[in-house]
């Protein structure tokens, strides 16, 4: 549920390597 400061509209979350995932076009962690 914590925003990772990254969007995932056109590309996947680069921050997925630290546990972030795409939700509603924004990368979130927990």
From Swiss-Prot:
Family annotation (InterPro entries): Cyclotide (IPR005535), Cyclotide_bracelet_CS (IPR012323), Cyclotide_sf (IPR036146)
Post-translational events: This is a cyclic peptide.
Disulphides: 4-20, 8-22, 13-27
Span of the signal peptide: none
GO BP annotations listed: defense response
Keyword Disulfide bond: yes
Pfam families: Cyclotide (PF03784)
Keyword terms: Disulfide bond, Plant defense
Cross-link Cyclopeptide (Gly-Asn): residue positions: 1-30
Keyword Ribonucleoprotein among UniProt keywords: no
Family: Belongs to the cyclotide family. Bracelet subfamily.
Domain notes: The presence of a 'disulfide through disulfide knot' structurally defines this protein as a knottin.
Function: Probably participates in a plant defense mechanism.
Protein name per the record: Cyclotide vdif-A
